[in-house]
Structures are given as C-alpha cells and as structure tokens.
Regions:
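Feature captures the catalytic ectodomains and active-site-proximal regions of enzymes
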Residues: 1-350
Length: 350
C-alpha cells in the first residue's frame, strides 16, 4: 500500500531513518533550514508520500507500530503513560524500567525478529542510553544495537550497518527535532537549527548509500505549538471520581472509580468545553482510533474515559509528571492533521 510494485526489486539493504516529531505539515518551515528538506518537499529527489501516525500521536505508540508492523490495539503500547491493570501502577513507556515485563506486555513478534528469522541482519542505531530499556526489549527484539547520538554518527553507523551480511535492515533514530519543538517551539531558531543538523544525517546516508540499498525517512508524529492549557492541579473538582490520570497532554486517559463515568465526563466536559472531546473507552475503540482490532489486554490499558484535545490546547499539571511538562511549547498526541500526518520519503540508489 505504501510501496509500488517492484519498488524493492533488487534491494538487499534497507535503512529506515526515524526523525522524531518531524510531521508532514512541518516540511515547509523545515525547508527554510535545509536545502535537502526543501528538495524532498518539492519532489526533486526521491518520492514523498504523506502517511498517518498512530492514535495517540505520540512516540512510544508510533515506534511500536513501526517496529512491530501492527496498530496500537494489537501491540498494546497504547498510551504515553497507561495504568497497569493488575497493580494500578503507571508505566511510562519511554522511561520503562522493566516492569511490567516487556516481553509479556508486548508479546507480538517484531519486524526485526521476523526479518532475522529469514536471515536478514538487523541493527538499531540510536542513543546507547536506550539500549536496555523496557521499550527496547518490547519492540526492538531481534536487532543488534549500535550506539550513536550526533547526526553525523548516526549516518556513519547506519552506512556501516547496511554493509553487514548479504541482506540488512537498519533502523536509525534521531530525537533532535522533537526535543527542540518541545522546549522552544516549532519554527524557533533552535528548531530550525535542529532541522539543519538532522538533515546532515540524511545527506551523509545518501552520499554513501550502497547501490543495492533503499532509504526510507519517516516520523512518529507531528506537533503543534500550544496556546492554551488546563492545569488539572488547579482544579481539584476534576479529580473527584478519578483514580488515575494518564496519557499525555493532548490525549488524556481517565481511570475512574466504579460508577463514576457519567459524573466525571460531565465535569471534564464542562471544564474543557469545545477545546477537547470527552468520550468513553468503548466509543474510542469503536471509532477505530487504535486500529481495527483491540485485544483484551489493550482494552484494559485505555482509560475509562478518553479526553482528545483539539486545536492547540493541552491538559497539564498531572500528578507524577515531570515539573517541566506544563511549560513545554510544542506538544502532540492529539488527532489534528498537524500531529497525525507524517512524511514517508523513499530513495533508491541506482
């Protein structure tokens, strides 16, 4: 569906470069900082196609779908943070210390496991600090890990990994654009600098891409600059009937006390007004937000109520979240086109 017939004919080596936070609708602004991005946007090199991120449009969910080839309802990594049904604890998927057990939490075979079983040498190129995390164990099983942080290092290690074995699959990750967007905002000088630096990784890979290789560049989500926030910690009435708040600022999960759904939905609906939609878990599933199938385990992890923020609004001030979160300028997780549309750029050498 994404690749035309024969597009991979003769290709023995594939590199996938994931640029965190690099939404499709950001390409126009990004082109100001990178002639490579501008050429990609204009169709001068490779093939650019808009595709859709996951719901929620947040990093661990989309990375899991990419790494497993499954929608969130199947792989079960279905929120930035979710409540563990058995214990009631919160798991933050990007800071996962190994509990709950990653192989049990996400039991589906990864793309790397399937490829490795067919003789493909698989490598992940990313920050070494992520190597032994729960998320890595859950979604990158089957791949070797090569540490690299700076864009030029990622490019060099990607090329080196492509040359391993007769057939190779390399997945590389760069967080720079997302980080700059969170702390400084889309379009800020810092964001444009991050785009310029990351584009050097694209240039480096293109320069040395083997003749029998293809490069795919994509993202996990886009981003919006916030203009309005609801601070839950300033509204104690919103905590009545709520046991736990999870998710992220643009897509909140509310785990309610038994029988409190209607009361909580009414209170939150009055607080967010037209800035967000408050719906029940079953309605969110019925709309297909998490894919055509949601497993029983996945269903349990979704909040009893789901609060999907519109426009440039977010819900912050949630107990247990880092104190800098309410100050973040760029955020994502919601359903807007700016968050959901991501690029898929393909380039074949030779």
């Amino acid at each position: 569906m994404l690749l035309r017939g024969g597009e991979l004919s003769g290709v023995r080596r594939v590199a996938v470069l994931l640029l965190d936070g690099f939404g499709y609708h950001l390409l126009h602004q990004a082109g100001q900082a990178s002639s490579t991005v501008e050429a990609i946007r204009n169709g001068d090199i490779g093939t650019l196609t808009p595709i859709t991120a996951t719901v929620p449009s947040s990093t661990p969910i989309s990375l899991a779908s990419l790494a497993c080839g499954l929608p969130p309802g199947r792989h079960g990594i279905i929120g930035f943070t979710v409540r563990v049904p058995d214990s009631g604890d919160l798991v933050t998927h990007i800071r996962w210390d190994g509990e709950p057990d990653p192989e049990t939490w996400q039991p589906e075979p990864t793309c790397f496991e399937r490829a490795a079983a067919d003789g493909v040498v698989c490598t992940v190129v990313s920050d070494g600090a992520f190597r032994d995390t729960g998320l890595t164990r859950a979604i990158y099983r089957g791949a070797d890990w090569t540490p690299a942080i700076a864009p030029y290092e990622v490019a060099e290690e990607t090329i080196a990994a492509l040359h391993r074995g007769r057939r190779s699959l390399v997945y590389s990750y760069l967080p720079d654009i997302d980080t700059a967007g969170h702390f400084h905002g889309i379009g800020s000088p810092e964001w444009l600098e991050a785009v310029a630096e990351v584009s050097e990784a694209i240039d480096g890979i293109l320069t040395d891409l083997p003749k029998d290789a293809s490069l795919f560049v994509t993202a996990d989500h886009g981003m919006v600059n916030l203009t309005e926030r609801l601070h839950v910690d300033r509204h104690p009435d919103l905590l009545e009937g709520v046991e736990t708040i999870a998710g992220d600022g643009r897509m909140r999960y509310l785990y309610t006390r038994a029988g409190a759904d209607a009361e909580v939905a009414a209170a939150w609906g009055a607080a967010v007004r037209d800035r967000a939609e408050v719906i029940g878990r079953d309605e969110a599933i019925g709309r297909g937000w998490f894919g055509p199938v949601v497993t029983a385990a996945g269903r349990e992890r979704i909040g009893d109520l789901v609060v999907a923020c519109r426009d440039t609004f977010a819900i912050v001030g949630v107990e247990g979240e880092p104190p800098h979160v309410p100050r973040l300028i760029g955020q994502h997780g919601g359903l807007t086109a700016a968050e959901m549309a991501v690029p898929l750029w393909t380039y074949r050498n030779g």
